[in-house]
Amino acid sequence: MHQSTLPCDFALPAEWEPQSAIMLTWPHAGTDWKPYLPEITDTYLELADIITRYEQLLVATPDVPATRYQLKKKLSAEQMSRVLLYEVESNDTWVRDHGPLTMVLRRKQNTWMVPYRILDFKFNGWGEKFRWEKDNAITLKLYYQAAFNADIENHQGFVLEGGSIESDGKGTLFTTSQCLLAPHRNQPLDHDSIDHLLQTFFQLKRVVWLDHGNLIGDDTDGHIDTIVRVAPHDTLLYVGCDNPEDEQYEDFQTLEKQLKGLFTWEGYPYRLLKLPMPDPIYDEGDCLTTNPESEGDRLPATYANFLILNKAVIYPTYNQPEKDEEARKQIQLAFPDREIIGVDSQTIIRQHGSIHCITMQLPEGALRDSTFHI
């Protein structure tokens, strides 16, 4: 890690800073959700219901009339007035990774600058594992439809997913070496080269690389938003594993040790809040089970994959009441002034993601049609 010498006119805001909207890319029969499309659509409608209580909702969908019809059956007229629908084709719905990464102008004296800047990185299906070409084009298509109150920078020469980075809004970016150094992303670039590029793109003071904590079943090669999340007042919420019988035990114990050795840019230790590790969940094709004798694939269930709204936090639950409640309490400690709302995410994890993975926040003012305030 080293300090950037670049002028810091712009910053990548922390997720808890004021927002204009949350973006969703809507599920449809052409996505991998097809086998359980009714169930995942219900989950998206539940998310839309919660989000529109607090802020606007931008929806990218290949079928605006059908999606509007679904939303109108669930939402009130007042909530529907906060929904913005844009017609865009998609391969899948993981907007955290194909959506816009929005920088905000911090030095307000630079009045000649557009105060928001979208960085459009290349999304390639997490190293060309899945179809990605349509998803990679979504941000630019929304820009040309005048969805954003922002300039846009083309960074299609560099692969980067939103779920692979966490910003504290003060110049520190967290990421994982397992993901950013994974094959089929940015080779032959090495650690130092990628570190320098991240500092340049996001005008950072430093990048903190985490080297452990890769969830079994994670298709992303270890996204930071599945294991460690940044919260206000130099707080890190992280997934712990205290069960020596869990095959992930050693890896997450080592992650915990690394976190305890980290210091803020100012030289203080971080406040650490441990989230529980959900009991293992296995996909047996026609159903999910927590039976340890299952021969199904283990899914990457995690409580770290929560979404921060203006006055609330939506966090994933997994029909594990004690652990669901323990996670809620820890998240509440990090966000004492926000309502903590659980959403059953058992359908989402069947495609190896959770709530944060299917959502993307837009900072306050970055949306072209931004008239709603709460």
For every predicted segment, state its role:
Residues 1-374:
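The feature marks the mature, well-folded catalytic cores of soluble enzymes
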